[in-house]
Each structure stands twice: as C-alpha cells, then as structure tokens.
Amino acid sequence: MATFKDACYYYKRINKLNHTVLKLGVNDTWRPSPPTKYKGWCLDCCQHTDLTYCRGCTMYHVCQWCSQYGRCFLDNEPHLLRMRTFKNEVTKDDLMNLIDMYDTLFPMNQKIVDKFINNTRQHKCRNECMTQWYNHLLMPITLQSLSIELDGDIYYVFGYYDDMNNVNQTPFSFINLIDICDKLLLDDVNFTRMSFLPITLQQEYALRYFSKSRFISEQRKCVSDSHFSINVLENLHNPSFKIQITRNCSELSSDWNGACKLVKDTSAYFNILKTSHVEFYSVSTRCRMFTQRKLQIASKLMKPNYMTSNHRASATEVHNCKWCSTNSSYIVWNDFRVKKIYDNILNFLRALVKSNVNVGHCSSQEKIYECVENILDICDNEKWKTSVTEIFNCLEPVELNAVNYVLFNHEVNWDVINILVQSIGKVPQILTLNDVVTIMQSIIYEWFDIRYMRNTPMTTFTVDKLRRLCIEPKTVDYDSGISDVE
C-alpha cells in the first residue's frame, strides 16, 4: 500500500481541515476511467500504478481512482496536490513552509500515536506493531519530489513516493532538494516525530526517512509527444481540432510557492475554497512537439523517386505508379498543411535534380534518395541541415570564387514560385547552399513556423497564462486555411 495514501486516509479523520485537504479519490468510491498501461506515480496519491491522462494538462500523471476529482498540479485551487507543487526557484523559506504544512496535516505526538494504536488494536491479532498496520505513522517528512520542465518553467511536486526504482514512463524525474534546506533541521524534525513511535516502528521510520532524504537526484527528462493523451495524438492530423481541458480554479494568491501556507490559517483557507469553480478551455495543438510528430510521420511515407520523375501531378496526387504513389489512407494526409509541404518540397527538389543531374525516370536508383530521410523534420535542425547539405552535394555543384553553385532552370509550381519571390526576392537560375536552405525553410515555415512555437502544447500553461490568452484571444489557432506567413 502507498504510504502517502494511507496517511491521508487515517489523518483526514482528526479534524475538519484534514477532512477537506486530505480527501483523495483513491480513498473514496471508485469511478471508472480510461484504462492505460502507462506506469508511474500518481501525483495525487503518490502510489505507483497504471496511470491515466489528466483532464487539466492531458499528460499521464493520475491514477484511475484519483482521476474522478480532476486535479492537476497546474490548477489554481488550493487542493493538496497544488499546495505540494512548487515552481522554478525554490528557497529555504519555501521548504520550511512545506515542512510546516506536513507537520500541520500529519501531526505526530503521543496523543495521536496512542489514538491510532488503540484503534488498530481493537481488531483481532493486531497487538503486535507490524508495519502494514501502522503504515500511516511511518511517513517521514522529506524533500523528495517529482520534477518536470515545461517551456522554461520547472515544477516540483513534493510527496512521499514509495519504491523509487519502479518503472517510470512519465516525464517526471525524482529530484532531491535537501541541499537547499538545513539537513540537520530536517533530521531534527523527523527524529522528534519518530520519538513518539514504539521502538519496533522507529527503525522502519528511520530507514524510510534516510532512503527518501539522502538519494541522488535523477537527470531531468525531456517531455515528448508520447507523454500526452492518445486521444490528442490521434486527432493531431485534423487542422481544426482543439484540445478540451478543465482546470480547478479559485481566488488563490499569485505567490505560487506560498500556497502551502494556507493550512496555517483555517478560516482563510475555507474562504478561498468558497470561490472554487471549474474553468473550461479549448486550446490549440500548435507546438513544436506535435508538429515534429506530424512531419516525422510524413517523412517515413516519403517517396523520393518523385524527384526524378516526369509526373505532371503533385507528389501526393500521383496514382498507379509503383515508385511514386503515396498511400493516401494514412491519416497524416488529412492535414492539408502537411500535404502542401510534402508537395512543394518534392516539387522544388525535383527542379533541382532535373536541372543538374542527367536522370529521366522515377524507376532509376539514385544516391540522392538516401539523403531525404529527414528533409521534412526541420525541428531537428542539425539533422535537417545535414540532409540539405548532402542533397546539395549530390547535385554536383560548381565552385566559383570559393562558393558552390547549382543550376535552377526547371519548372516549378506556382506555390514554389511565390515562396522563391518571398524568400530571396526573385526566381533565380543559380542557387548556393544557403539559398537552398532558405527556400526549403520557407516552404515549411509557411505552414509550421517552428521559430515562434512553444515546445509543449498550451495544455501545460498555468491558469493565469490561459486566462490572459483567452482575453486576447490566442488559445485557438488561426483559421485552418491561413498559413503562418499570412
């Protein structure tokens, strides 16, 4: 059993404040939620289990029991998960406030310990102090946290997480912030708490405390598209698709790390809870992470033979050709922007090949085909520029005054002509490597200008950010028929 979950279950009975703050979905009646196979720690109840996606940020960080309350660490309501979540620079004072909150919600004194022990001994065969019967008393106060970085903001979700060596498929990593705090002071707090326990339980408490307070922090993970709900990923190829999220909100102070101090003033805490409400947001999928996913899928479906073909149709409209036909059944082609990029990139590359290399049919096998594998994935800038350079070198460029040039005298479509004029000011007859890079960047940036995209989706924004964007409004994309340039 998860220690934190057990502690919340037993301690919520001691007073009104605890009954409100320590209420967890995992300790209440179970309500079904979408089953998944993502393994990790539920941020709400701290148990290691199968996770489902959060309705507030669409990431997998909540168990199927706790999902019924829809709590997210990015909420603006002072529930326990939010009060345990700290942001960016964490000071020693912040950590002391956190320790005070733990001590307030999970007090340890002789009266409390005797009460729990007496209640437990009322059951048969429970006269011995076995750990499974007193798990709720064996939760030490530590600075163990699960941390994540979202577009420059670092979040620390403190709690007591058992079995740190278990499989973790979430983007959260274990970070120990004890170096910021006074170790001796934290030791003293826990030794004082431990002194009220029976001797047989003190050893287990000490082992748990030192194992969770002296561990080495993990390397912070990178958030990827696989960490978000499969429902979102399956709809990325619909340009008009919007992600629906809900956030628990209240009139909480803008002092993010100060939320944990609310439990010291019970009346103020309950006054804030009276303002609690749910806010709904419809946000765009637009971000580098999801854009890269779409472009990578299209790259895997690319038919490079089109570069040497004589087809009059655009690359995605070629049918009944063994070497050039694309499989139109893939949902990535539902996004007309991906189709436009695919068509224009191959149209431009075909013009380069036809202008410089003596090839005549799409059935021919050319070395240049090996260079286009990453040509759409501009999000990985280093690999992308390497691919463009390799393609340029395959065109047998001519050196003049230490600069390499290739010819450009083959027809292109009107879309590419417009991009040529916009990017380099004219329709040229010779091109340098820099010209080719600029033109190909412009073809992709016309629809997906990653230079101005955030890395993660807007579902990872705080409530304050979402509210500001709603006022402007920028929570939804532009009309689906308008490009980034327009």
Curated annotation (Swiss-Prot):
It is found in: Host cytoplasm, Host cytoskeleton. GO terms for biological process: symbiont-mediated suppression of host cytoplasmic pattern recognition receptor signaling pathway via inhibition of IRF3 activity; symbiont-mediated suppression of host cytoplasmic pattern recognition receptor signaling pathway via inhibition of IRF7 activity; symbiont-mediated suppression of host NF-kappaB cascade. A motif (IKBKB-like degron (ILD) motif) lies at residues 479-483. One of its GO terms (cellular component) is host cell cytoplasm. Residues 1-81 are annotated as: RNA-binding. Keywords: Host cytoplasm, Host cytoskeleton, Host-virus interaction, Inhibition of host innate immune response by virus, Inhibition of host IRF3 by virus, Inhibition of host IRF7 by virus, Inhibition of host NF-kappa-B by virus, Inhibition of host RLR pathway by virus, Interferon antiviral system evasion, Metal-binding, Phosphoprotein, RNA-binding, Viral immunoevasion. It comes from the Viruses. A motif (pLxIS motif) lies at residues 480-483. Residues 42-79 are annotated as: Zinc-binding domain. Residues 317-486 are annotated as: Interaction with host IRF3. One of its GO terms (molecular function) is RNA binding. Residues 82-176 are annotated as: Important for cytoskeleton localization. The C-terminal region is phosphorylated by host CKII/CSNK2A1. Phosphorylation of the DSGXS motif is essential for host NF-kappa-B inhibition. InterPro entries: Rotavirus_NSP1. The integrity of the zinc-binding domain in NSP1 is important for degradation of host IRF3. Belongs to the rotavirus NSP1 family. Interacts (via C-terminus) with host IRF3; this interaction leads to IRF3 degradation. Interacts with host IRF7; this interaction leads to IRF7 degradation. Interacts with host CUL1 and CUL3. Interacts with host BTRC. Plays a role in the inhibition of host innate immunity by inducing the degradation of key host factors required to activate interferon production such as IRF3, IRF5 or IRF7. Associates with components of cullin RING ligases (CRLs) including CUL1 or CUL3, which are essential multisubunit ubiquitination complexes, to modulate their activities. Recognizes the host NF-kappa-B regulator BTRC through the presence of a DSGXS motif in the C-terminal substrate recognition domain. This is Non-structural protein 1. It comes from Rotavirus A (isolate RVA/Human/United States/WI61/1983/G9P1A[8]) (RV-A).
